[in-house]
Amino acid sequence: MQSVCYSNWIQYQTFFNHFNPLNLFIMSVYCLKKTQFIPISLDAAWDFFSHPKNLAVMTPEYLNLKFTNELYGDEMYPGQVMTYNVRPVLGIPMFWMTEITHVVPKKFFVDEQRFGPYAMWHHQHHFEEVEGGVLMTDLIHYKAPLGFLGDIAVSLFIKNQLEGIFVFRKKKVEELFPWNS
């Protein structure tokens, strides 16, 4: 008897999810992909980018990123939680909590927002050894909050702000790891 009730609940859930009028207000998922060649060894790239404190080095000053928790160890690990304040809009402080969910040393790691300014944030950091250095790829999937209003915010300023952050990071990487080092 209970399994029938459970089965009916699943059928109801499936029907409701497919024909839910609230789906009209569900926001879009956006994707940002950035690739950069770095003329250093895979070991050197991993050593730098897998240290959470270096996030502050790679973040534009106007965001005023400040860690609010103690970071344990020098290298990230699955389950590591980082909390920080950023000021992305009009200098207004926002709390952000991310978790490192996956780490494959010298290949990739993933951070996901647990609480913060986005409805969803999933950021993959990939490293591939190539001739003369490393190809670093960032792949971000994100959703803005507030449904269609969030989609409007993405088109008006969030997308441009993320692009600007990665322009800054590209220049910072070129400054930290110049071609003639």
What do the predicted segments below correspond to?
Residues F67-F115, F168-K171, E175, N180-S181:
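Glycine-rich portal/gate segments that line the openings of hydrophobic small-molecule binding cavities
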Residues Q113-G164:
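Beta-strand/loop substructures that line and gate deep hydrophobic ligand-binding cavities in soluble
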Residues L42, T101-F108, H126-L135:
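A short, structured loop/turn motif at beta-sheet edges
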